[in-house]
Every structure is written in C-alpha cells, then in structure tokens.
Regions:
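Mixed-charge, glycine-accented linear interaction segment located at domain edges/termini
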Residues: 125-179
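Oligomerization/assembly interface segments of phage tail-like spikes and tubes
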Residues: 68-91, 147-161
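Generic "edge-of-domain/loop-turn" microfeature
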Residues: 28-31, 88-90, 115-117, 127, ...
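A general structural signal for short secondary-structure junctions and capping/turn motifs
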Residues: 72-73, 98-100, 109-110, 143-147
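Short, conserved charged micro-motifs
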Residues: 90-98, 164-167
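Short, acidic/charged, Gly/Pro-enriched secondary-structure junctions
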Residues: 97-124
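Solvent-exposed edge beta-strands and adjacent loop segments
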Residues: 2, 10-82, 128-145
Length: 179
C-alpha cells in the first residue's frame, strides 16, 4: 500500500480509555457474516437469538492495545483486551470461566471514550481463523482491606491488519439477541 494523502493534525479533544466491552462466542457468527466497506465494518450478521454480551468492569480498568510489527516481511498486529472484574463471587467467576474457557475463541466489540466501536478478533483476510483467546487470568484477594479483589483478564489475538472500526451498527443492535 502506498502513501496517497496528507495527514493533518486536529485540535479536537481525543480521550483515552474504553467505555465498554462485549464478547460473543466464535460459533455464534457464521463465516462470511462480517463485511467491510472502505476500511470499516458495516455488516455483522449474528445467528438467530445470539448477541454480544457486555462485561461490566471497574471504571478505567478496560484497555484495548494494538501493537504492530514487521516480521520476515509480513505485517502483524497483536490485539489485546485487558479488563478488571471486581469481586470473586460465583457470578463473576462463572462469567470469567465462560469467557476464558471458550476454546474456539471469541470476538469482541470495544467502544472507546470517543464513541468509536471497534471489532476485535476478526480480520478481512483471515475471517474467523484468529479470534481472541485467553492470554491470562490473574485472580486474587489482595492483602489489605483497601486492595483490589477480583480478576484481571487479558484476551489476545493476531491479525495482519489493525482492528476495523464499526459504522452504521449501534452498540444496542449488537448487544440485543438477533432475530
């Protein structure tokens, strides 16, 4: 790909952080059910009754990272989502187990603090072949009364592209069972 345009800086505010994250099992999306137009995801067809499930985390504890590198002449991006789920109760632990033990992998949608939604765990070239999978699950009680008690989950995948933004599809549409 050649450089074909200038990049001008903008004076508008850009905030860091992630507002929310939701996951769906790989088996709930058919191959070819996602399409991209002009570098943006504009179609995601979910199986009937399926949806992305929101994982509420502590404020300012969700992070999406995208690290690119050139290896042997090939571009590779490592996508990571890290979130902290407060508490070690059964409900939280069951939700974590469902996420990290999904051996076929998951896709995620992440909404950043600027309102842009990204699809993570899918690539136009590889379709559903490189979904997100658990990299780590670190749970603990903390030592003192004011220490964090809960789980830090890291999900990761590799792709030949940066994650695609989603346009024309709302968060509410993706997190409501498909009909």
């Amino acid at each position: 790909m050649a450089i074909t345009a200038n990049l001008a800086s903008t004076c508008s505010a850009i905030s860091g952080g992630v507002r929310r994250v939701a996951f769906i099992s790989l088996g709930d999306i058919a191959e070819g059910a996602i399409s991209v137009t002009s570098g943006e995801v504009d179609t995601i067809t979910l199986a009937t009754g399926k949806e992305f499930f929101s994982y509420d985390a502590e404020q300012d504890t969700i992070e999406w990272r995208e690290n690119g590198e050139m290896v042997n002449g090939s571009l590779k991006y490592t996508e990571e989502i890290e979130l902290y789920i407060r508490g070690n109760n059964k409900t939280n632990r069951d939700a974590i187990v469902a996420l990290v033990e999904d051996l076929c992998g998951v896709l995620a949608i992440v909404e950043d603090s600027n309102g842009t939604i990204f699809l993570i765990g899918w690539s136009e070239d590889l379709d559903l072949d490189r979904p997100l999978k658990m990299a780590s699950d670190a749970s603990g009680s903390g030592k003192e009364l004011t220490d964090l008690a809960g789980s830090t989950i890291t999900m990761t995948c590799m792709s030949p592209h940066k994650a695609f933004p989603i346009t024309g599809i709302t968060w509410a549409t993706l997190t409501t069972p498909a009909s």
